[in-house]
């Protein structure tokens, strides 16, 4: 059975009081291991989601580490709410690198009308300077990522049309087609209410290893795992019945949104997967999985 092992019982990244934009929470981070370093693009807020004053706005910060645990960070965000679609912020980024370019999908939250959240895309050559490419799908949608390489010459995206995980294909990153659901909630289980992806899929010899999040009827968020076919990733070839990580530590159970472990990023170094996750929508933790232990 696949289980994640926490590298630390403490968060690896916490809010920073002296930086106003990230003084309340840091969570739900993208992650990638590249050029010998662990890179995070993390979501941060200046107030809590239930604050009686001000607006809850998410921005994206950057942190870097040599060992995956001890991080240095920039004092200013790398992306802030600068467009109409981002009036209330940029949420839950996920990053892949294809042909030397970093592609980041994130949720732009406009809050101009009901369900005003959209998948957005930005690109970068250095993880610091980002160029917005705009809205990917003009519909209420979130939890999206590209696969880290083209499959059969096409870009492939996972996204979330509530309450399922969907897949879609594109030739140009603008026009998406062949949308279909690939993973659905299972009634009366830990994944009964909704499912959505964690970080981008990871290529293994047996298939695309995908970590996903799921909520139950009590809004407890856990992480699960599936394996997708290498050539046709719309096919789920294995799905573990049990979660691979669930809220157990104090900072996973208590925070702005209690009982949540929620991942947006995996950093693969050698044969170890570092899974970064938000704890209770307040701090960031990390757990690992050895590639050899991916056994369904």
Swiss-Prot record:
Q: What top-level class of enzyme does the UniProt entry assign?
A: transferase
Subunit details? Homodimer.
Q: Does the keyword Transferase apply?
A: yes
Say which domain of life the source belongs to. Answer: Bacteria
InterPro entries from the UniProt entry: Glyco_hydro_beta-prop_sf, Mannoside_phosphorylase
Q: How does activity depend on pH?
A: Optimum pH is 6.0 for phosphorolytic activity. Optimum pH is 5.0 for the synthetic reaction.
- Which Pfam family, just one, is annotated for this protein? Glyco_hydro_130
Q: Which UniProt keywords apply?
A: Carbohydrate metabolism, Glycosyltransferase, Transferase
Q: What does this protein do?
A: Probably involved in a salvage pathway for GDP-D-mannose biosynthesis. Catalyzes the reversible phosphorolysis of 1,2-beta-oligomannan. In phosphorolytic reactions, prefers 1,2-beta-oligomannan with a degree of polymerization (DP) of 3, 4 and 5. Produces alpha-D-mannose 1-phosphate, which is the precursor of GDP-D-mannose.
What protein name does the entry list? 1,2-beta-oligomannan phosphorylase
The answer to whether the entry has keyword Transferase is yes
What species does this protein belong to?
Answer: Thermoanaerobacter sp. (strain X514)
Give the Enzyme Commission number: 2.4.1.340
Question: Which Gene Ontology BP annotations are present?
Answer: GDP-mannose biosynthetic process
Q: What protein family is recorded? A: Belongs to the glycosyl hydrolase 130 family.
């Amino acid at each position: 059975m696949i289980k994640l092992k926490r590298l630390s019982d403490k968060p690896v990244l916490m809010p920073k009081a002296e930086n106003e934009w990230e003084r309340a929470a840091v969570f739900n981070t993208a992650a990638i291991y590249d050029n010998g370093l662990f890179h995070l693009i993390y979501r941060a807020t200046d107030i809590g989601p239930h604050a009686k004053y001000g607006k809850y706005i998410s921005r994206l910060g950057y942190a870097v580490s040599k060992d995956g645990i001890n991080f240095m960070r920039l004092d200013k965000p790398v992306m802030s709410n600068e467009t109409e679609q981002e009036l209330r912020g940029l949420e839950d980024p996920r990053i892949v690198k294809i042909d030397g370019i970093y592609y980041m999908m994130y949720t732009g939250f406009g809050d101009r009308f009901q369900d005003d959240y959209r998948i957005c895309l930005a690109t970068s050559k250095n993880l610091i300077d980002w160029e917005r490419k705009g809205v990917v799908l003009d519909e209420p949608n979130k939890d999206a990522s590209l696969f880290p390489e083209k499959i059969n010459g096409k870009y492939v995206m996972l996204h979330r049309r509530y309450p399922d995980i969907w897949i879609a294909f594109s030739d140009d990153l603008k026009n998406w087609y062949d949308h279909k659901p690939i993973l659905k909630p299972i009634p009366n289980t830990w994944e009964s209410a909704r499912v959505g992806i964690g970080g981008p899929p990871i290529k293994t010899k047996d298939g695309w290893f995908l970590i996903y999040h799921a909520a139950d009827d009590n809004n407890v968020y856990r992480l699960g795992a599936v394996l997708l076919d290498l050539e046709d990733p719309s096919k789920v070839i294995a799905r573990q019945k049990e979660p691979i990580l669930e809220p157990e530590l104090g900072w996973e159970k208590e925070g702005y949104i209690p009982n949540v472990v929620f991942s947006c990023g995996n950093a693969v170094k050698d044969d170890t997967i570092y899974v970064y996750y938000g704890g209770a929508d307040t701090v960031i933790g990390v757990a690992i999985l050895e590639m050899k232990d991916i056994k369904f």
